[in-house]
Amino acid sequence: MKRKILLTMTLFALAATLGFAKKPAERWSEEKANAWMAEQGWIVGCDYVCATAINQIEMWQAETFDPATMDKEMGWAEGLGFNTVRVFLSDLVYTADPKGFKARFEEFLGIIEKHHIRAIVTFWTNGGKCKNPKLGKQPESVQGVHNSQWCMVPGTEVVNDPTKWHELEVMVKDIIKTYKNDDRILFWCLYNEPQNTQRGVKKTLPLMKETFRWAREINPSQPLTAPIWEIPSSLTPQMPTVTWVWENSDIISFHCYKEPDYLEKFIKLLLPYNRPLVCTEYMGRPKSTFKECMPILKKYNVGAINFGLTAGKCNFHLQWTSKAGDPEPKVWFHDIFRLDGTPYSQEEVDFIREMTGVSKK
């Protein structure tokens, strides 16, 4: 009850600031979006989960928040020439303690700013293997399993029940309002891979529409987007979702773990939208590699955000199909560094540095 009262007070405070009848801002024009992109330079970086965190809860809750490791890893990212990291938030951590969550998020932003890095902030995602996620001590990593305890946010039950979206609205509006003019935020990724309906989620599109509306009411200086995870076919039931995303995002984001030819085909499909393009997930060896994909992304000035930095608790370096007890693979799937900071492949690291230009400094 205390938590609900606190969240209600937060929403009323936001409403008083914004005005109850405030009309949502409109989608950015092509000219505004492209002018924004021209100011950024080439966007390059990684999807980031702290190596000591098994999921979003462990990354952000007070008991396990690990700024020392974050600082160390952001130093490695800076050394690669990365200027961006994409992070995933936790509604459970925020709702339990909005003030504490925001204090830790602010500390994280201070760390990345120190290393000349900006954040892509992701709110919701339908992917996850952790059943009934709860605050406190998190389940242990399962040896041999890729991303064994990742959390759906906010989860199937909440996504499918609009009466429970009130707390989500509070979170979205509070965080975006706080950072709406903050240069440390590159852009807002409101819903990760909304095409993903494999875990019983039925109201992704309605929730995504509402989340965009909440964000538009705040009208941040940073663009809004949601990434598509594959080229849609004429037979996909997700076409309404894909169409809505591409017609309402300020910038176009997408994911691609397939071969370089497919990546270039995907990019060419999106170019007619005449909006900035950012690939917010790629690089899954052996099909999608830095050496083959980074030059294509840079050629078209498409933002390049590979998945993973350090092979930590999440086991991102293992294949999606890995099973409990599987041995360490000779060929990593994601990630760049081992826990001690040594590269999985020095040749890859040298290539990344060449592509980002830091090898010439």
Kindly give the residue locations of the regions a language model identified.
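Conserved catalytic-core segment of NTP-binding enzymes
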Residues: 266
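Catalytic domains of carbohydrate-active enzymes that cleave complex glycans
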Residues: 350, 354-361
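Active-site mouth of glycoside hydrolases
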Residues: 23-249, 255, 260-262, 273, ...
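Catalytic histidine-centered segment of alpha/beta-hydrolase-like enzymes
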Residues: 316-318
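Catalytic His-Asp charge-relay segment
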Residues: 276-278
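Bacterial Sec-dependent N-terminal signal peptides
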Residues: 1-22
